[in-house]
Amino acid sequence: MALLSFERKYRVRGGTLIGGDLFDFWVGPYFVGFFGVSAIFFIFLGVSLIGYAASQGPTWDPFAISINPPDLKYGLGAAPLLEGGFWQAITVCALGAFISWMLREVEISRKLGIGWHVPLAFCVPIFMFCVLQVFRPLLLGSWGHAFPYGILSHLDWVNNFGYQYLNWHYNPGHMSSVSFLFVNAMALGLHGGLILSVANPGDGDKVKTAEHENQYFRDVVGYSIGALSIHRLGLFLASNIFLTGAFGTIASGPFWTRGWPEWWGWWLDIPFWS
């Protein structure tokens, strides 16, 4: 694949965290690096384990295939392969692939001399995965509290997990997570729509400037956050979708065992309206 005119300028040595020049190369448009190699290794091994574990199951229906975590009786120990051991190995591969990909992003950022905002943002969903598959099961004392790898089985797990606490919508972490999701979608949707509107004027009109963008939002909501800050806001909102969701998830079980509607009892005791 031919390089674009400006790409060679940025394909410089250095910036690697491990391996030095040994892994400091590109394959086509893709930077490899040590963590690119480790990511490929974990992805290949994990997918192979999923395929082999599926071959030991009762069906090849892609919707019904399920790699289940160990039974609660195994606690935090290693389980036999067909009784949750595959799930444990696949989870290790998933974490290895996710973390490798994040560190590869760090190396690319170091090469370009830019901030680490992208890898730090990617850390947030990795943290959410760790909460579900590692931290919460550790606090509860068994890997069996994690979710299975499968389409329908995962949906069943989400459904059953929510009903264990009567109504998951009353979970304050879930409430906050969904609120951040909706606000983020609205904010970045408005931003994207505005950029398209100023960059695609009607026939005979000139492309508009940042001043037009700022004035539009001043007219609509009385304030414009600015072209740079809207991306900071988007990062903040998107990160908090996972962070507040992780709080609500890890609190369920280790720190709160009753239905989430009961948690709101304090609201009824506030002197103003009690």
Swiss-Prot record:
Periplasmic topological domain: 54-83, 140-170, 250-274
Species annotation = Blastochloris viridis
Q: Which PROSITE patterns match?
A: REACTION_CENTER
* Function, as annotated: The reaction center is a membrane-bound complex that mediates the initial photochemical event in the electron transfer process of photosynthesis.
Q: In the UniProt record, what gene is named as encoding this protein? A: pufL
Q: Which family does it belong to?
A: Belongs to the reaction center PufL/M/PsbA/D family.
Q: Which residues cross the membrane?
A: 33-53, 84-111, 116-139, 171-198, 226-249
Q: Which residues are exposed on the Cytoplasmic face of the membrane? A: 2-32, 112-115, 199-225
Xref: SUPFAM superfamilies = Bacterial photosystem II reaction centre, L and M subunits
Annotated residues that bind a ubiquinone are located at 217
The record's listing under NCBIfam families reads: pufL (TIGR01157)
UniProt keyword terms in alphabetical order: Bacteriochlorophyll, Chlorophyll, Chromophore, Electron transport, Iron, Magnesium, Membrane, Metal-binding, Photosynthesis, Reaction center, Transmembrane, Transmembrane helix, Transport
Q: What is this protein called?
A: Reaction center protein L chain
Q: Name one GO cellular component term.
A: plasma membrane-derived chromatophore membrane
Q: What is an annotated GO biological process for this record, any one? A: photosynthetic electron transport in photosystem II
Lineage, top ranks: Bacteria, Pseudomonadati, Pseudomonadota, Alphaproteobacteria, Hyphomicrobiales
Q: Which Gene Ontology molecular function entries are recorded, alphabetically?
A: bacteriochlorophyll binding; electron transporter, transferring electrons within the cyclic electron transport pathway of photosynthesis activity; metal ion binding
Q: How does it assemble?
A: Reaction center is composed of four bacteriochlorophylls, two bacteriopheophytins, two ubiquinones, one iron, and three highly hydrophobic polypeptide chains (designated L, M, and H).
Q: Which residues does Fe cation bind?
A: 191, 231
Q: Which InterPro entries does the UniProt record give?
A: Photo_II_D1/D2_sf (IPR036854), Photo_RC_L (IPR005871), Photo_RC_L/M (IPR000484), Photo_RC_L/M_CS (IPR055265)
Q: Which residues bind (7R,8Z)-bacteriochlorophyll b?
A: 154, 174
Record membrane topology: Multi-pass membrane protein
Q: Where in the cell is it found?
A: Cellular chromatophore membrane
Q: Does the keyword Magnesium apply?
A: yes
